[in-house]
Amino acid sequence: GGPIFYGHAARGFNESPKHEDNAYWYQAVRANEVYQMLDGKQLKAALLGKSRGERGKNTVELSGKTTGLAGIRVGDLAADQKGHVMKVVGDLLAPFREEDSQEAIKHIKAGGIENLHLSFYRDENLGDDEVWDVWQLEGPNMVSYFRGLPHVHAWLHIREPS
């Protein structure tokens, strides 16, 4: 295994802030729903300046770390917020076969849902609408990096915990 990359430029290279007709934008919409659920202290932890950016397959290199990752720790969220993060995970895995999605969920849970960290990037906001186009979800054995600027590119890397 290793990381996978997917993307879509629905209406051309430079999409509008609403990403009309983009096949994967629903994933960012769901992540932004989590953002809307956060309170002041949580927002401060989750909203960062600039993302890691694209670095080929190293964009989603796994660190194996449970602490010191970018963003807010899912373990510090309320139960309803955690539930919504799991909906984000479900959306990330929706394009894949059911058996592959279930195996991926098993690996993510083995690394600890509470050890996932969710971050959004204000310096890469298309349209200055505070609907965050660039965000990531990272844990010890999973990284999802979503870049919706100028169109959607997304990376996903999940491995069995070591």
Regions found by a protein language model. Give the residues of each.
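A cross-kingdom marker for long, charged
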Residues: 1-162
